[in-house]
């Protein structure tokens, strides 16, 4: 009997040890699962943070060029869709939290990153963000852009905007006229002619050109855009003002030209962006796929688009040409959404968001 009781007690102790071991194993399993879950969550957060930081670094799609037959069909059917409309996705169709009746509180948090499959279909115009650059390469680039050659065979050899070297002759205050009465005689003759013109009714009206606007106040809505986009802490720059012509709103052209000679300032590009816009001399392709910088344009209605900013050479029959900056690959969408028309006065301001070149389009 005693041996049986001892055996039962021995089994009870073994069962207790087994139960304790199972409990410990279950505890360890739970701890490992929790650690794995925490590790996965941290990796997901880091991946999301990295994705957010790189939200502007994406490739813009190339515009699909339609065939000649399709272009003729579009011209014959003006009610049809434009063949030059941008192939870029409309960034304003993405639902966001700021699309409310109150336009004073916009928010610009919608993603602008495309998946890998779409990236393969896009062109090579991209956002440039490169702080490390070669000083010698930069100097060579700006020397090329400022070259004074009149040959039209190369893009960079066309005449560019150069600082004016004209000087006005300042009269010498110590100069004495050889004829003491010459000044008096001139004044008398002018007065006599003025009296005769008033009597005959043939008074010429002097055309006074309006004074240029030396200082343009930045619109308040640009401050709001920069604040909600977390833009870089720098003052926006007014680079271009223009009254729109027919070519600027032509859907078949789909671009806004900014001649170098008409720019208010031309110091808003980084050296990396200048290199990206420089034409590859060895590239014989007609599309110039390697030229251009991806930018973001925002209008007064707090709408934004991804456009391409590049150098555009306008060649003339005389052999000379002009250099222009141009915004395309989506300009038709900007014209339509902003209700732009011939005669509208526009101004372009530049700022940067996380180092990316952005434009603010203001209309009067």
Curated annotation (Swiss-Prot):
It is found in: Nucleus. The keyword Transcription applies. The keyword Transcription regulation applies. Signal peptide: none annotated. Residues 148-202 are annotated as: Disordered. Its main location: nucleus. It comes from the Eukaryota. GO terms for molecular function: DNA binding. GO terms for cellular component: nucleus. Residues 260-364 bind DNA. Keywords: DNA-binding, Nucleus, Transcription, Transcription regulation. InterPro entries: At2g31720-like, B3_DNA-bd, DNA-bd_pseudobarrel_sf. PANTHER family: B3 DOMAIN PLANT PROTEIN-RELATED (PTHR31541), TF-B3 DOMAIN-CONTAINING PROTEIN (PTHR31541:SF34). This is B3 domain-containing protein At5g38490. It comes from Arabidopsis thaliana.
């Amino acid at each position: 009997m005693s041996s049986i009781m001892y055996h039962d007690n021995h089994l009870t102790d073994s069962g207790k040890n087994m139960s304790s071991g199972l409990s410990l194993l279950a505890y360890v399993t739970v701890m490992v699962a929790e650690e794995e879950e925490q590790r996965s969550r941290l990796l997901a957060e880091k991946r999301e943070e990295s994705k957010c930081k790189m939200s502007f670094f994406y490739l813009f799609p190339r515009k699909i060029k339609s065939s000649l037959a399709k272009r003729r069909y579009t011209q014959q059917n003006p009610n049809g869709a434009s063949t030059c409309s941008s192939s870029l996705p409309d960034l304003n169709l993405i639902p966001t939290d700021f699309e409310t009746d109150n336009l004073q509180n916009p928010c610009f948090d919608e993603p602008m990153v495309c998946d890998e499959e779409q990236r393969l279909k896009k062109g090579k115009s991209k956002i440039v963000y490169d702080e490390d650059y070669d000083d010698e390469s930069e100097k060579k680039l700006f020397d090329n852009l400022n070259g004074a050659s009149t040959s039209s065979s190369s893009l960079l050899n066309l005449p560019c905007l150069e600082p004016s070297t004209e000087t006005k002759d300042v009269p010498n205050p110590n100069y004495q006229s050889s004829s003491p009465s010459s000044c008096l005689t001139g004044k008398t003759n002018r007065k006599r002619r003025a009296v005769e013109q008033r009597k005959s009714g043939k008074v010429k009206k002097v055309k006074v050109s309006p004074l240029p606007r030396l200082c343009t106040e930045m619109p308040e809505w640009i401050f709001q855009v920069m604040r909600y986009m977390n833009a870089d802490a720098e003052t926006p720059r007014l680079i271009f003002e223009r009254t729109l012509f027919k070519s600027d709103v032509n859907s078949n052209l789909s671009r806004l030209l900014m001649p170098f000679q008409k720019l208010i300032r031309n110091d808003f590009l980084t050296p990396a962006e200048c290199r990206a816009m420089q034409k590859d001399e060895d590239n014989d392709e007609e599309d110039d796929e390697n030229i251009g910088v991806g930018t973001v344009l925002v209008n007064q209605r707090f709408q934004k688009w991804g456009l391409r900013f590049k150098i555009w050479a306008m060649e003339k029959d005389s052999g000379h040409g002009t250099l222009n900056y141009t915004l395309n690959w989506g300009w038709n969408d900007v014209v339509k959404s902003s209700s732009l028309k011939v005669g509208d006065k526009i101004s372009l301001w530049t700022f940067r968001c996380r180092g990316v070149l952005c434009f603010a389009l203001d209309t009067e």
